[in-house]
């Protein structure tokens, strides 16, 4: 799809050719108050009160999500006009805008319309800008058009008719909106990669497949890539990481990707993604029901790859390193057993009380490995605990950090990206739950505060740099009829990196 921006000051009576320009459809918003403004007011004037008559007749009441196509409207260059209900004007916030945009796209995608003029991004949205609206509309459209059918015997290869979207914005918003359109398309491409990797079955998306995906990404976007095999990891004394792969015939892969967009000596942001391509729980076997969804236990890794793809396409002036410890967690005669003690790369010994708490075992060695990059910040992303789902459900990702400044940046990014996160506690008192009689620490701390003690475990390996942990167990995929990977938290991570690149620190 092609996205472009065109300035148009409706309020000043300057439509800049939008009314007479040729297109398949122009999208216009109508509030529930039935008061016309902006593009709707101009079109009403150009059509001698047509919209006013339609509203008075009750054909369009402006209620949120309603749509109405008008055909061959006299005085309008577009062959169709799509009216979209916006709901209450004084409550037109980001959610209402998103709902309106999705309603418009659904209506348009049900037709053979190819080229559209989209005016909704010019509407006044509470606490949001026009460039935000452009990017949000692009992401909403790309989410609706995403499909995963490549594993079917007859994949759906049909192309959507909709190809070209022109966003109208006010003259002063044009520059920012053009950047937002570029970033929105790049972000959608990154999210699609993350979704694809998550939705692939685990007999396809193995640790080796993730490594090959990273290599292809490096080739396509001129990134630096290194993949460490098990012998190299043994030489680095990654005993914790390797303990998880002990039961699998699939070789573990330790993947390192580097994007160099900032100054050569500028400290990078390191993203560490949990890459368990299938998690049976190991000897501490999971229940059979729903185990198929454990192919999504690599969504942290997928989000790192998707974020790096988006960042590379955006050309952000920042250095980013992606680290992915990739394994399968399988039961077998060679698998790690409950009660085994392993030694991490840092040298700390870990009593493995539960082999289903494996994510932290691979992440801790990756977090130690990250020290060599002298990072400005490290963020790990993991489908780590079911306890986080109990605490936060499926709306907010869990954010853990002792660094208030870093946590604040991530929360700001989550709000800007509409990819919500909620800060969770990380008090030292929780560390007592990880005490072991036989090793330096245990890999679980009991049922109370399970997501917190998991983050506390990781914090023991992050003393060398500012660090945050995102638990995405509740947000990385959906179950039920809408089963599939969401692409989160790529928007949050990308926005964090956009903000870091913009403030100048990343180029120093």
Curated annotation (Swiss-Prot):
Signal peptide: none annotated. Mn(2+) 1 binds at residues 279, 356, 358. Binds 2 manganese ions per subunit. It catalyses: Release of an N-terminal amino acid, Xaa-|-Yaa-, in which Xaa is preferably Leu, but may be other amino acids including Pro although not Arg or Lys, and Yaa may be Pro. Amino acid amides and methyl esters are also readily hydrolyzed, but rates on arylamides are exceedingly low; Release of an N-terminal amino acid, preferentially leucine, but not glutamic or aspartic acids. It holds the Pfam family Peptidase_M17. Its cofactor is Mn(2+). InterPro entries: Leucine_aapep/pepB, Macro_dom-like, Peptidase_M17_C, Peptidase_M17_leu_NH2_pept, Peptidase_M17_N. Gene3D superfamilies: Leucine Aminopeptidase, subunit E, domain 1, Zn peptidases. The keyword Cell wall biogenesis/degradation does not apply. Its main location: cytoplasm. GO terms for cellular component: cytoplasm. This is Probable cytosol aminopeptidase. PROSITE patterns: CYTOSOL_AP. NCBIfam families: PRK00913.1-2 (NF002073), PRK00913.1-4 (NF002074), PRK00913.2-4 (NF002077). GO terms for biological process: proteolysis. It comes from Paraburkholderia xenovorans (strain LB400). Keywords: Aminopeptidase, Cytoplasm, Hydrolase, Manganese, Metal-binding, Protease. It is found in: Cytoplasm. It is an enzyme of class 3 (hydrolase). Transmembrane segments: none annotated. Mn(2+) 2 binds at residues 274, 279, 297, 358. Presumably involved in the processing and regular turnover of intracellular proteins. Catalyzes the removal of unsubstituted N-terminal amino acids from various peptides. Its EC number is 3.4.11.1, 3.4.11.10. Belongs to the peptidase M17 family. GO terms for molecular function: manganese ion binding; metalloaminopeptidase activity.
